[in-house]
Amino acid sequence: MGTVGRSLVGKDVDKIVELLNKALADEWLAYYQYWIGAKVAAGPMRGAVTVELEEHATEELGHALMLVDRILQLGGTPLLAPQDWYEMTNCGYEAPEDPYVEVLLEQNIQGEQCAIEVYQKLVDFTKDVDPVTYEMSLQIMTDEIEHEEDLQALQEDIQLMKERR
């Protein structure tokens, strides 16, 4: 990052890099959770659920790329090893040991709800300190809110289908 850009962030730059790295850990784990969940999914509306999980996986990977770029712009070092993801994660990882679509949806809804909280904290922390990270965090949080809504809509559709049988 340029010296003027870094100086705008000031003394909080190391804390922001730490928060971004924790979010990066979450995004990588979310990417894999969505991707592998799409591969093993079973049950009613599997096709629709798989499409949604694959789409979300792609978007989580995009978030990871945004976070890495911002960490580098701030002069930080992004997490370099997968084992660091488990040490730094805010939201953890839920292996899709039960591939039933309703279980997968619930696991991923919980992940999205955690992600929304993570990005809300980033938005709050960077609002008056780092406008670039603030805008990026707001954009990612908006995506995470949409993901939660998408998954809950699928959950509701499955429930409605069961009730109408």
Model-predicted regions and their roles:
Residues 1-165:
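Iron-associated oxidoreductase/ferritin-like identity signal
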